[in-house]
């Protein structure tokens, strides 16, 4: 058997990089297995796509191939990396065989500087100092990270943070790289740049790549094979058969609301460090009661910061912020785990019932709406990222907030789940809620927004109706939707 960190000798047939054999897995509290005798074979050197509906088991399958993050539960079958059972790997062998990149770099980056993050995993593996410096230098040069090598990780854009997560993983030189929705939080330009780097790692370094994604079309030009996960099984599909995203049906048209402001921001200046760059630079925002406003712009433009400012979570160093609906607001941050704090899915939806005037019937209906009735007794962290996103949003919606602040609410969701979010925002709008959302999903913006504000250089450079925005925009026109 070839050791996990070594290539087979010349003339020998290459083993599959990843082989899943009759894998069955059931989460604690689950009624049915998420994976049921699932099998697949990914050839060495492939760029493979793993597709399927939200909650189909894509993330579970990937995590079971990386023992350090494998979920707890009942398991049968085998997962092999280069012919070896992944559960037999020692830590150094696991790092040399299988690397893993999460959907959110915030779940992966643990150090305060780029250079320390690059060295962190190598230090834990006991790599000698000279070899560590060589690996860090080579990897940073490969990914063009020199200009921001000594930057604070908190100052990086979303694209840079995801590139750092990828580079720090590859510095450990795995032969197989698993990625779970790695571009779902990136703007279109950052997504293209990241996929280009990933493709280079595959082609130039010979690393086998397996990507779980709801947007296979963006990666089809790089892929060599694709698999669909559904009903517990895995089947290979033709790249030409990968479904294009369905258009999102827009909410019923209405005139953009006018009247009093729900949130009024005047001349706001905000930065996170005394000597850091200003994230918001004299920004003005007037959010009208009852409107749905979308914030768009590149990674690092300040969308999340503006949501935090409106919610009172962040404080401006200069300027004024008035929130007339502060007592009735709900914030969905980029990480849904910030909202999820209970032991079971059902408990999440009942946590705020007493103070919000709903009961068991509404909770049961919400579980059914989310397709989580059979998962009601599972731990929320055992759900897929998309299911966690929907659960967190549903938890907020049950409280009927007057102001709903949403940060990337459709990230990592399939078409059906995105449609659910459109309807959820529409129901909140029709109930009189004011909605401020930040997103890279332009089809979602077109479906739900009354007005669109573009952030650039710390300011809102334009605010117009959604129809006006898409008619006038070159970058965000129909080509991006």
Residue spans of the language-model regions?
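Conserved ABC transporter NBD signature motif
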Residues: 74-85, 319-329
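Conserved ABC ATPase "signature" region
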Residues: 131-148, 358-375
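Conserved ABC ATPase signature
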Residues: 152-156, 160, 379-383, 387
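Catalytic Walker B motif of ABC-type/P-loop ATPase nucleotide-binding domains
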Residues: 177-180, 404-407
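ABC-family nucleotide-binding domains
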Residues: 187, 414
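H-loop/switch region of ABC-family ATPase nucleotide-binding domains
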Residues: 213-214, 439-440
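Conserved beta-strand-loop-alpha-helix hinge in the C-terminal portion
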Residues: 233-251, 459-480
């Amino acid at each position: 058997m070839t050791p996990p960190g070594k290539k087979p000798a010349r003339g020998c047939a290459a083993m599959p990089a990843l082989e899943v054999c009759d894998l069955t897995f059931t989460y604690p509290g689950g009624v049915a297995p998420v994976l049921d005798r699932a099998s697949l074979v990914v050839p060495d050197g492939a760029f493979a796509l793993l597709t399927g509906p939200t909650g189909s088991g894509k993330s579970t399958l990937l995590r079971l191939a990386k023992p350090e993050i494998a979920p707890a539960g009942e398991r049968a079958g085998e997962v092999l990396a280069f012919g070896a059972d992944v559960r037999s790997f020692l830590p150094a062998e696991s790092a040399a065989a299988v690397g893993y990149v999460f959907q959110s770099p915030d779940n992966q980056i643990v150090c305060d500087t780029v250079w320390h993050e690059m060295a962190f995993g190598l230090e834990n593996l006991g790599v000698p100092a000279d070899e560590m410096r060589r690996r860090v230098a080579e990897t940073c040069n490969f990914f063009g990270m020199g200009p921001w090598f000594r930057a604070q990780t908190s100052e990086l854009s979303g694209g840079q943070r995801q590139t750092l997560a990828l580079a720090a993983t590859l510095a450990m030189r795995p032969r197989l790289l698993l990625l779970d929705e790695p571009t779902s939080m990136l703007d279109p330009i950052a997504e293209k740049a990241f996929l280009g780097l990933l493709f280079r790692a595959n082609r130039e370094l010979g690393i086998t790549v397996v990507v779980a994604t709801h947007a296979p079309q963006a990666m089809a030009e790089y892929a060599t094979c694709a698999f669909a996960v559904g009903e517990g099984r895995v089947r290979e599909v033709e790249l030409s058969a990968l479904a294009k995203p369905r258009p999102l049906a827009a909410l019923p048209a209405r005139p953009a609301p006018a009247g009093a402001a729900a949130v009024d921001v005047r001349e706001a200046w905000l930065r996170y460090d005394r000597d850091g760059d200003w994230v918001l630079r004299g920004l003005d925002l007037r959010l009208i009661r009852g409107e749905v406003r979308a914030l768009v712009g590149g990674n690092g433009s300040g969308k999340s910061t503006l949501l935090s400012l409106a919610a009172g979570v962040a404080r401006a160093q200069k300027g004024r912020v008035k929130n007339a609906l502060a007592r009735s607001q709900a914030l969905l941050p980029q990480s849904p785990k910030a909202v999820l704090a209970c032991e079971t899915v059902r408990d999440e939806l009942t946590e705020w019932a007493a103070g919000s005037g709903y009961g068991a019937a509404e909770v049961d209906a919400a579980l059914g709406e989310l397709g989580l009735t059979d998962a009601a007794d599972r731990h929320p962290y055992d759900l897929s990222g998309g299911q966690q996103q929907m659960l967190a949003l549903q938890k907020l919606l049950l409280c009927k907030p007057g102001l709903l602040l949403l940060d990337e609410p459709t990230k990592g969701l399939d078409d059906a789940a995105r449609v659910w979010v459109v309807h959820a925002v529409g129901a909140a709008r029709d109930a009189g809620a004011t909605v401020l959302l930040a997103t890279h999903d332009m089809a979602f913006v077109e479906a739900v927004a009354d007005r669109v504000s573009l952030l650039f250089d710390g300011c809102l450079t334009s605010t117009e109706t959604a129809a006006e925005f898409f008619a006038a925009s070159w970058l965000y026109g129909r080509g991006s939707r």
